[in-house]
C-alpha cells in the first residue's frame, strides 16, 4: 500500500493554470513576443517561473540582461498574484477535498510538490493548508520539473520514499518528474498531452482513495 500522495497544484487542486497562461501571454505581448498560445502553454505547465520565462524568450530568440530577466519574472508574478486574490474554497476541483479527507482519515501522508512559489498562499485561500503534512519548497530544489527534485523533496518531507508514493499531475513535465523520482504517476488530462504509458483520468472527480488503491495494486502485480 502506498504511504503518501504527492500533489501538484496548478491543474490538479485548482485551475490556477489558466491565470498563469493569461499572465505569461500578457507579459510576452508587452515585450513583443507572439506565439504564447494554448498549445505553447503546454510546455510551461509545471515548469518553474524562471524556466518558463526562458522558454518564452527563446521563442523569439530574445536576449535580456540578468537584471531585466529578474524584472520580467517579477512583473509576471505580480500580475498573476493580482489575478489569484479572489481564489476561494469554491475553486477547489471536484473530488479533491474528499480525497484529502479520506487520505487523512487513513493516515496516508499528503505533500504538495508544486513549482509554484505561491503554493502556500493558494492552499490558505482554499482552506486546504491543514490537510497537508508538508509543502516542498520549489526555491530549495536544484532543478525544476521535468527533473524529479520537487517530488523527491515532497516525499522525503513526509518521511516516505518516493517509491512508496503516488504523484498526481496534469503536465508532461510533472509526469516525467514523478516517473524519474520513482513514484507512481496518475495523470489528469488527455493521453495526447500526457502520454499513453500511464493511468490518466479525464478529470479530478476520478481521484478517489479507492481508485488510487486500485491503480497501486495493479502496478504492483
Swiss-Prot record:
Mg(2+) binds at residues 8, 10, 170. Its EC number is 5.4.2.6. Changing residue 20 to A: Impairs Asp-8 phosphorylation by beta-G1,6bisP and phosphoryl transfer from the phospho-Asp8 to the substrate beta-G1P. InterPro entries: B-phosphoglucomutase_hydrolase (IPR010976), Beta-PGM (IPR010972), Beta-PGM-like (IPR051600), HAD-like_sf (IPR036412), HAD-SF_hydro_IA (IPR006439), HAD_sf (IPR023214), PGP-like_dom2 (IPR023198). Induction: By maltose, trehalose and sucrose and repressed by glucose and lactose. It holds the Pfam family Hydrolase. Changing residue 45 to A: 20'000-fold decrease in catalytic efficiency. Binds 1 magnesium ion per subunit. The active site is at residues 8, 10. Belongs to the HAD-like hydrolase superfamily. CbbY/CbbZ/Gph/YieH family. Monomer. Catalyzes the interconversion of D-glucose 1-phosphate (G1P) and D-glucose 6-phosphate (G6P), forming beta-D-glucose 1,6-(bis)phosphate (beta-G16P) as an intermediate. The beta-phosphoglucomutase (Beta-PGM) acts on the beta-C(1) anomer of G1P. Glucose or lactose are used in preference to maltose, which is only utilized after glucose or lactose has been exhausted. It plays a key role in the regulation of the flow of carbohydrate intermediates in glycolysis and the formation of the sugar nucleotide UDP-glucose. The catalysis proceeds via a phosphoenzyme formed by reaction of an active-site nucleophile with the cofactor glucose 1,6-diphosphate (G1,6-diP). The phosphorylated mutase binds either G1P or G6P and transfers the phosphoryl group to the C(6)OH or C(1)OH, respectively. This is Beta-phosphoglucomutase. It comes from Lactococcus lactis subsp. lactis (strain IL1403).
Amino acid at each position: 500500500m502506498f504511504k503518501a500522495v504527492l500533489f501538484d497544484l496548478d491543474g490538479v487542486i485548482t485551475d490556477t493554470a489558466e491565470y498563469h497562461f493569461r499572465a505569461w501571454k500578457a507579459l510576452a505581448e508587452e515585450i513583443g513576443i507572439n506565439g504564447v498560445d494554448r498549445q505553447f502553454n503546454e510546455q510551461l505547465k509545471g515548469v518553474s517561473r524562471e524556466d518558463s520565462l526562458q522558454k518564452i524568450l527563446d521563442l523569439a530568440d530574445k536576449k535580456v540582461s540578468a537584471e531585466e530577466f529578474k524584472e520580467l519574472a517579477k512583473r509576471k508574478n505580480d500580475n498573476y498574484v493580482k489575478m489569484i486574490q479572489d481564489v476561494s474554497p469554491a475553486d477547489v476541483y471536484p473530488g479533491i477535498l474528499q480525497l484529502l479527507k479520506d487520505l487523512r482519515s487513513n493516515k496516508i501522508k499528503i505533500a504538495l510538490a508544486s513549482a509554484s512559489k505561491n503554493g502556500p498562499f493558494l492552499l490558505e485561500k482554499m482552506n486546504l493548508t491543514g490537510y497537508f503534512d508538508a509543502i516542498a519548497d520549489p526555491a530549495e530544489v536544484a532543478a525544476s520539473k521535468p527533473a524529479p527534485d520537487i517530488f523527491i523533496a515532497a516525499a522525503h518531507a513526509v518521511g516516505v520514499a518516493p517509491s512508496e508514493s503516488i504523484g498526481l499531475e496534469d503536465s508532461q513535465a510533472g509526469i516525467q518528474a514523478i516517473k524519474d523520482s520513482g513514484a507512481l504517476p496518475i495523470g489528469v488530462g488527455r493521453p495526447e498531452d500526457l502520454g499513453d504509458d500511464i493511468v490518466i483520468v479525464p478529470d479530478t472527480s476520478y481521484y478517489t482513495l479507492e481508485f488510487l488503491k486500485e491503480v497501486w495494486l495493479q502496478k504492483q502485480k
